[in-house]
Amino acid sequence: MLGQSIRRFTTSAVRRSHYEEGPGKNLPFSVENKWRLLAMMCLYFGSAFATPFLILRHQLLKK
């Protein structure tokens, strides 16, 4: 009896957990607006590129 109720709960939980399908729907950010996506990617990759230079500048200016 307990096993049946657990099985019923898990199958109903799986049925309720449907998500949207299609290109870009499984990403943690939206790809619908290409200009916002471009700005976010430039910010992300630009900050990763600039970090070593900013650290170097900080170390050189330190007294």
Curated annotation (Swiss-Prot):
It comes from the Eukaryota. The keyword Transmembrane helix applies. Residues 61-63 are mitochondrial intermembrane. The modification N6-acetyllysine is found at K25. InterPro entries: COX7C/Cox8, COX7C/Cox8_sf. The modification N6-succinyllysine is found at K25. CDD domains: Cyt_c_Oxidase_VIIc. One of its GO terms (biological process) is mitochondrial electron transport, cytochrome c to oxygen. GO terms for cellular component: mitochondrial inner membrane; respiratory chain complex IV. Pathway: Energy metabolism; oxidative phosphorylation. Keywords: Acetylation, Membrane, Mitochondrion, Mitochondrion inner membrane, Transit peptide, Transmembrane, Transmembrane helix. Residues 1-16 form a transit peptide. It is found in: Mitochondrion inner membrane. The chain crosses the membrane at residues 34-60. The keyword Transmembrane applies. SUPFAM superfamilies: Mitochondrial cytochrome c oxidase subunit VIIc (aka VIIIa). Its main location: mitochondrion. It is a single-pass membrane protein. Component of the cytochrome c oxidase (complex IV, CIV), a multisubunit enzyme composed of 14 subunits. The complex is composed of a catalytic core of 3 subunits MT-CO1, MT-CO2 and MT-CO3, encoded in the mitochondrial DNA, and 11 supernumerary subunits COX4I, COX5A, COX5B, COX6A, COX6B, COX6C, COX7A, COX7B, COX7C, COX8 and NDUFA4, which are encoded in the nuclear genome. Belongs to the cytochrome c oxidase VIIc family. This is Cytochrome c oxidase subunit 7C, mitochondrial. The lineage of its organism: Eukaryota, Metazoa, Chordata, Craniata, Vertebrata.
